[in-house]
Amino acid sequence: NVIESNAIGDVLMVQADFDPFYTLQAVTLAFGIDAKPIDIKVSGKAPGPGGAILEFENNRFANLTFIAYPSEFPEVTEITGTKGRITLEQPAHCPTSLTVRIPPITPSRYMRDNTPSPSQRFDYPLPSSVSVPRAFVNQQGFIYMIEAIHRCLAARLLECPQFNKQDSLHLMEILHGVLKYR
């Protein structure tokens, strides 16, 4: 894991756009499932467009933009650390690629000659064995979640070790903190 290995340094910022649930999943991915916001500012009324800024300890922030349908939006997630950046490419809620950028000199490429950071792209192809009629973009990528559930059921597990009940409840608590202002 690029975040856990500290390859991008300490995560300082998450920027994401889509709906509150998916953007908040990116926040818990970046800051850790146990991170709790110390302040939440929300603008906009559901189901229209809006946004939220979540502040976490140690001067860390999440800047989330909630879109309204129909509209054209980037749906890209950026996770910025002290040493580099991760981009979950479009569509970020179920991406097929991510890009890691780590400049040779930190804290910023702007400190020198403004040369773009070297990047490394990782591609995750969609399963070709799944046909989903009238599917949304990359929807067949969710097959990986379904396979994880099947593995847990076959092993007689009551919850998935990668995202357990406590993780789900924590994410729902943060989601409630955002939605109560929308």
Where are these regions (language model features)?
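Short helix-loop capping/hinge motifs at secondary-structure junctions, enriched
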Residues: 6-11, 156
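Rossmann-like dinucleotide-binding domain that binds NAD(P)(H)
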Residues: 9-80, 90-92, 166-170
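C-terminal helix-rich "cap/oligomerization" subdomain common to oxidoreductases
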Residues: 57, 144-182
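Short polybasic amphipathic segments
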Residues: 77-79, 94-111, 117-127
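Active-site loop of classical SDR/Rossmann-like NAD(P)-dependent oxidoreductases
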Residues: 113, 118-126, 133-147, 163
